[in-house]
Amino acid sequence: MSFYYRRIVHFQDTDAAGVVYFVNVLAICHEAYEASLAAFDINLKVFFSNQEIAIPIIHANVDFRRPMFCGDELTIELMPKTWGDDEFEISYQVFLKEVGKKWAARASTKHVCIHPQSKSRQKLSDEIRRWLLSFQTF
């Protein structure tokens, strides 16, 4: 199962050449991640300010197939996958409305669950495990 997030490319997302700046693709993907959490009724304010659990990104990558310009309508497909008790990875595909099923960019982020003060790994919260389970297909 996937989560879909729609967004328009804003002028601030682009570089001097008028295309989406590469780092901003990751920011757009992170917006999709946040939207999926919110759609699952996870309180974002509590989630991102939690003093007992933090889920930083430990690896990210992005590949590009075609340019994206200001005003382009994007659909971001988000597909999380669990990697054990304390980490998960999210794969993203970014589609341009006018191109259809061909992706413009692909990205992934790997997240690990830690305690914010000790920085030691810990198990994912029940809330995040439920969110991850909602994407599994049996």
UniProtKB/Swiss-Prot annotation:
It comes from Trichodesmium erythraeum (strain IMS101). The active site is at residue 15. Its EC number is 3.1.2.28. Pfam families: 4HBT_2. Belongs to the 4-hydroxybenzoyl-CoA thioesterase family. DHNA-CoA hydrolase subfamily. InterPro entries: DHNA_CoA_hydrolase (IPR022829), HotDog_dom_sf (IPR029069). HAMAP family: DHNA_CoA_hydrolase. Catalyzes the hydrolysis of 1,4-dihydroxy-2-naphthoyl-CoA (DHNA-CoA) to 1,4-dihydroxy-2-naphthoate (DHNA), a reaction involved in phylloquinone (vitamin K1) biosynthesis. Keywords: Hydrolase. This is 1,4-dihydroxy-2-naphthoyl-CoA hydrolase. GO terms for molecular function: 1,4-dihydroxy-2-naphthoyl-CoA thioesterase activity. SUPFAM superfamilies: Thioesterase/thiol ester dehydrase-isomerase. It catalyses: 1,4-dihydroxy-2-naphthoyl-CoA + H2O = 1,4-dihydroxy-2-naphthoate + CoA + H(+). GO terms for biological process: phylloquinone biosynthetic process. The keyword Hydrolase applies. It comes from the Bacteria. Pathway: Cofactor biosynthesis; phylloquinone biosynthesis; Quinol/quinone metabolism; 1,4-dihydroxy-2-naphthoate biosynthesis; 1,4-dihydroxy-2-naphthoate from chorismate: step 7/7. The keyword Hydrolase applies.
